[in-house]
Amino acid sequence: MRDFFFDTANIEFIESTMEKYGSDIKPNWVRGVTTNPNAFSKIDKFHLDEWINHAHKMGHLISQIRGDNNGEIHIQAPFSKLDPEVILEYAKIISDVTHGLCKVGMKIPPYQNVLEYVDEFNKHVLTNVTGLADSSTALKCCTYDLNYISIIPGRMEEVGIDAESAIAFVNQCNFGKTEIITGSQRTTEQIIYSFYLDTVPTIGEKCWNDIFQGDNFKRILDIEYGYEPVGPFSPLITQDNIDLSLAFFKQMDGLGDTARKDLEARLA
């Protein structure tokens, strides 16, 4: 089994999951926690100070689970169209509050003006371009010095997009340092093929019990990482891919609006 991220901001859930399944999960398999405004909304946290305080708690928890300070918490910018300099200040705030506990991954949108700021972000945090729903945009992002890109197969498959082929194509074309995170997983099968495709999957609350049903966990442990080449041409990119990414950021921007206002007031 390779590394994974907990896809939740619910500390109590992470603690109970490790208590229940910790004997089967090696501590260093837990890469960390990934969150976004939707994850914070599910635990009724909408204000910036709540996000900052919770980031510290998550960093402390991941440090305890792993027994080191090499774990990661990934926090999304509260609004996708923030000026890159504002996102950088936000990244510094989160990095300061988690100093000595863990690394911080800043989840940023795939917009050109933000991508051009990646070198500045990298001086302070790990960089993770999120909300990707097509192979072309994903590969464009990989030309920048990013630590991660996050593809959203669960959401892609809900609208009939072949996420597995898209991820395999990106992996076979990406020769840089950028790792692929597979997020928004809906089923254990998606998690299994995400491991098979040599990505770092995120595992949300709904999937954990199912992972330990039947032979699912054994299948994950026995996976030989790799995949068959999918050919020299990118999977077809349609309006569905574009609409899905736009809908993702529209949802996150709405849920992060309170934190955005708090951040802008704090930096004014």
Model-derived segments and spans:
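Catalytic cores of alpha/beta
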Residues: 12-25, 89-90, 116-117, 134-144, ...
